[in-house]
Curated annotation (Swiss-Prot):
Name of the featured protein: Sugar fermentation stimulation protein homolog
Single GO MF descriptor: DNA binding
UniProt superkingdom: Bacteria
Originating organism: Vibrio vulnificus (strain CMCP6)
Family of this protein: Belongs to the SfsA family.
GN (gene name): sfsA
Length: 238
């Protein structure tokens, strides 16, 4: 995924109301940009961090700038725009970067499924194999004690719990079911379920894996010009 036009940078003052952030532009002026991330953003929104933002050509938008990447004091790059995770996953599948998901004939997004009024992020299908249901989750939480250790989720997620129940049902019904962790933090080298944050999610994930749900974990190469989801890394839910 290339950023066109190129991203601009600013310094973060504060994030607030979940969807907004005040920044200082390179010109010295201050302003407000949109933040497409409703999560906790732990470690991703420290005042003084460098913010890389895109600019929409939609003149009707109240906040035309969108926060895409955080560059931390430690030099880590973090894609905080949660919309990008699904886009990156689709690109990675279509480009053949995720070998475990190759060989399918058709790719659909946001397809209704399950019994809890859900929409699957990605549905793969082919004439010679069962359908493959893929739920994509963005991983940006880096542990502050163990180097390289990432966690998901970064807050209690009832929505994520629902998705695990839906995936479990798909696996039990004979379909292929995938939980794809898209690691969007340059400092994360391995991922684990955040038992200390959402014990219920960790429990449901173990049940899902026993039922046949596969967990894939891919890390993105991140720069202020391009992001590619193309490197498999380890996942643990012990």
């Amino acid at each position: 995924m290339h950023f066109e036009p190129a991203l601009d940078c600013a310094l973060l003052q504060k994030r607030y109301k979940r969807f907004l952030a005040d920044v200082t532009y390179q010109s010295g002026d201050t302003g407000t940009i949109h933040c497409a991330n409703t999560g906790a953003m732990t470690g991703c929104a420290t005042p003084g961090d460098k913010v890389w933002y895109s600019t929409s050509n939609n003149t009707k938008r109240k906040y035309p700038h969108s926060w895409e990447i955080t560059e931390t004091e430690q030099g880590h790059l973090i894609c905080v725009n949660t919309i990008r995770a699904n886009q990156l996953a689709v690109e990675a599948i279509e480009q053949g970067w995720i070998k475990e998901l190759s060989g399918y004939e058709r790719l659909q997004t946001e397809v209704k499924y399950g019994h809890e009024n859900s929409r699957i992020d990605i549905l793969l299908s082919a004439s010679d194999r069962p359908a493959c249901y893929i739920e994509v989750k963005s991983v940006t939480l880096l542990d502050d004690t163990e180097p390289g250790q990432g966690f998901f989720p970064d807050a209690v997620t009832t929505r994520g719990q629902k998705h695990l129940r839906e995936l479990t049902e798909m696996a039990q019904n004979g379909s292929r079911a995938i939980l794809l962790f898209a690691v969007l933090h340059s400092g994360i080298e391995k991922v684990a379920a955040a038992l200390h944050i959402d014990a219920k999610y960790s429990q449901l994930l173990k049940q899902a894996q026993k039922a046949g749900v596969e967990v894939l974990c891919y890390k993105a190469e991140i720069s202020n010009t391009e992001i590619k989801l193309n490197s498999a890394i380890a996942f643990n839910n012990s």
